[in-house]
Structure formats: structure tokens, C-alpha cells
Amino acid sequence: MRVAMLTREYPPEVYGGAGVHVTELVAYLRRLCAVDVHCMGAPRPGAFAYRPDPRLGSANAALSTLSADLVMANAASAATVVHSHTWYTALAGHLAAILYDIPHVLTAHSLEPLRPWKKEQLGGGYQVSTWVEQTAVLAANAVIAVSSAMRNDMLRVYPSLDPNLVHVIRNGIDTETWYPAGPARTGSVLAELGVDPNRPMAVFVGRITRQKGVVHLVTAAHRFRSDVQLVLCAGAADTPEVADEVRVAVAELARNRTGVFWIQDRLTIGQLREILSAATVFVCPSVYEPLGIVNLEAMACATAVVASDVGGIPEVVADGITGSLVHYDADDATGYQARLAEAVNALVADPATAERYGHAGRQRCIQEFSWAYIAEQTLDIYRKVCA
């Protein structure tokens, strides 16, 4: 069996959960079968890379993406099965299936109709990305959802989709890469920032998008206990508008309290591991999240999590066991922000519970989110669609 794995992101260009998913999945699948990675961007080891047509440099970003999809589809002719990830490569998978009469497996990491804020980023291209996703999903031989909540969303958004074709295979975590680091050393990223190791610390890691709820967290931080520091590892803004909103919110917070740190540069895994391990609590304020690999990363570092109760997050963060879930209400932003602050303050005030949540979170990662198991599940899907 030869798999053509289609992805926008692949190391060293990985900036989101879908890229992490593909990276880890490929590493384990290659122990089981032949996998050719087809990605977008600059040439790199271990993958075939494709750039958008330069003649579309000033075109809408969706059109530019689709030009790379066409080349990617053409390159998948030798595959036994083609496996696409996100709308960015869904059309390539769909076309390869038609051209070469091979099965198409599609992993949905999010759903375009449930991310209306993408209009800010893509303009009319949002309608294109939505059309691409719908076309590919409804024609795929199998669809993988990264959580049960995601599967439910898919069947609701695409009611004509055959439920028997939609399988749940959750994201995973490599607990040998993500583990509790020792105390921050002199010269470490936290020491260089000036973070006080004797004060509690709440941490956020993620992209600056409306989906991730960064402004909700920064606003909630006005209600944090006065000794709580906030470390935001946040970059790769979707749009200048949302970047400006976060910038204004962080500046206002910093005027009103000490211990506000914003890291906009891309960090290494080692640096992120250090920050997550040092955190008193990791906060995930997402307003939409099919699963949320970053919660697994924090849990693997034995850190308690405070997270919204949206999407697949409750399938990762066990409320009252590995962290605290906070109800998100799109019609009550103020209430949501107050609840986030309350949950953070409660764990800061109870270090024993925070420590217990952290240890339980790491055990949950080890026992239930192994990439080796996820690769076996994925291979089973390939076998079924090729039978």
C-alpha cells in the first residue's frame, strides 16, 4: 500500500494542530506502510512540496491555494489511497480520486461553515473554501473526524453525508516529546522574559484567531488574582484586524497589572515544553475547537487545564479530573470571561488540586492518546476503502 498524504503544513513549516497531527501520524504510519507526503511551500526533506502558481500572487488566497492543489493532485498518481487534511488539500484529494480511480480519505480538522470569521481573512474566498470542503466531503470514500463532537457537527452541517462513512479518530500526543520539564534555568525563555518563578502563572499557546478566543482570555485576566502572571505565546494572526484587537487588549491589561508577557515569535518545542511545565494553569479559551491538541500538550507536561466546553475539548479535558471546563456562551461574553477568571483563580488558590489535575492529565495522555494506536486505526480505514 502506498499512501499519498496531502497537507498544507509539514515540518519545518507547522503552525497549527492539523500540521502537528499530520507530522506525528506520518511518523508512525511509515512504520506500517509507504507514505509520500505532499505539502505546500518551500522544498524540504521527507516531502514533495508545491508552491502556488506565481501568476496568482495577487489573487485571492483561496485561488492561490487551489493552484497548488492542481499540481498536488497530478503528483498523486502512484498512490493506492489518497488522504487529505483540511480544505486546503481537499480538492487535490478529490481530483486525484477521480483522475486515478483511487479511494479518497479526508480528515476534517474543522468545518468551514462553522468558522464564519474566516470571511475576514479570505473575503469571497471563504465561499470557495466552503464549496471545496463540501464537494470533497460528500464525495470521499471515508471521512475522519478528530472527535465525536466533530462527527456530530459534520452530520449536522452535511445532512446528506452517509453516517457509516464518518469515523472518529482523535488527535494524539507524543508523551516522549511532551513531558514535565525541570525548573526554568538561567538563560531560559522564561528567565529572559523576566517571569517571576515565585508567582503563579497562567499560560496560553495558540494562533491569533477569533476561533482561539485570545481576547476573551486577555479581558478575563483583568479579574485574575493580583499575583497571577499571564504568558501569551501567540502569533500568526489571521488578519490585521484581529492582531490589532489583541494588541490593544494586551496593552490595556499591561497598564493595569504587572506580569503580562506576550511572545509573538515562533518557539521551539523545548521552549514550549519549558513554559507549559512551569505554568500553574494552562488556559484554552477557544470559542470553536474540534479537539485541541494544545490541551494534550499541556496535559502531557503535567499541567492543569482551564478550557472552554466547546467542540471536542470535553473529550480531552476531563472536568474535575484533569482540569476545569468553563461554559462558553456566544451571547454572554462578559459572563464567559468572568467564569474563565474564576476557574483560573480557583486553581491558583489550590495548588494541591492543580498538581493532582496535572498528574492525572499526563496519565490520560499516556493511556488514551497514543499516536501508535491512531496510526493503526487510520491504516484500518485505508484497508476498508481499498477492499
Curated annotation (Swiss-Prot):
Pathway: Capsule biogenesis; capsule polysaccharide biosynthesis; Glycan biosynthesis; glycogen biosynthesis. One of its GO terms (biological process) is glycogen biosynthetic process. Pfam families: Glyco_transf_4 (PF13439), Glycos_transf_1 (PF00534). It catalyses: ADP-alpha-D-glucose + alpha-D-glucose 1-phosphate = alpha-maltose 1-phosphate + ADP + H(+). One of its GO terms (molecular function) is glycosyltransferase activity. Keywords: Capsule biogenesis/degradation, Carbohydrate metabolism, Glycosyltransferase, Transferase. Inhibited at high G1P concentrations. Disruption phenotype: Inactivation of glgM affects the production of extracellular alpha-glucan (two-fold reduction), but not that of intracellular glycogen and 6-O-methylglucosyl lipopolysaccharides (MGLP). Cells lacking this gene are also impaired in their ability to persist in both the spleen and the lungs of mice. Combined inactivation of both glgM and ostA is lethal, potentially due to accumulation of toxic levels of ADP-glucose. Combined inactivation of both glgM and treS results in absence of alpha-glucan. SUPFAM superfamilies: UDP-Glycosyltransferase/glycogen phosphorylase (SSF53756). The keyword Transferase applies. NCBIfam families: glgA_Coryne. Maltose-1-phosphate (M1P) is generated by two alternative routes: the TreS-Pep2 branch and the GlgC-GlgM branch, however it seems that TreS-Pep2 branch provides most of M1P for the GlgE pathway in M.tuberculosis. This is Alpha-maltose-1-phosphate synthase. It comes from Mycobacterium tuberculosis (strain ATCC 25618 / H37Rv).
